[in-house]
Amino acid sequence: MLFRSRIRSIDALTHLVDDPYLVGVLAMRHAVSDVWAMGASPTTALTLIAVERALSQQLEASDFVQAQAGLQDAAHAYGVEIVGGHSLSLNQPMIAVEVEGECARSVHKDGAMAGDELWITGPVGSGILFAALASGFTIGASIDQWVTNALKSLFEASQTAAREGVNAMTDVTGFGLAGHLREMLSWNNLDI
């Protein structure tokens, strides 16, 4: 009998675009990518949907239904079953997704070793984009390109890397490439 590791990860995404359905899709994709980055296949998810408190309960309900539909469609596309969740209204909309996955061999970001190569499987720079958006800058074309890239699946790349025996993997998001690389190297007192 082959032992399978269970992996869990949780991630949250604020509304970077004005389409609650698309935010639901992106939130699920963002969460499963953390599981992929550990060499696992996602299986189940719990969701938390915070819709923006509106003057109209009808608008809140509509945003919730759209976000839930985006989460469900993305979960189906990635082979994930949503097994529960919660919803609420806040001053700022947000979706959080906890994903569980399974793998024969989990790969973590603390396994980097001297002599390892750095592979980057997608574009970088989203941290700068998010910081600009948080500061009130309008960057329409860049956000559209980010959405297109964010929807691409990295499942095959992560599975191949795990099979090939890589020592460490991570999903480059919140801390940017430099931040994640620094974190990965610090575990074993490595440098570039």
Q: Where would I find each of the regions flagged by the language model?
A:
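Helix-biased detector of long, well-ordered alpha-helical tracts
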Residues: 1-192
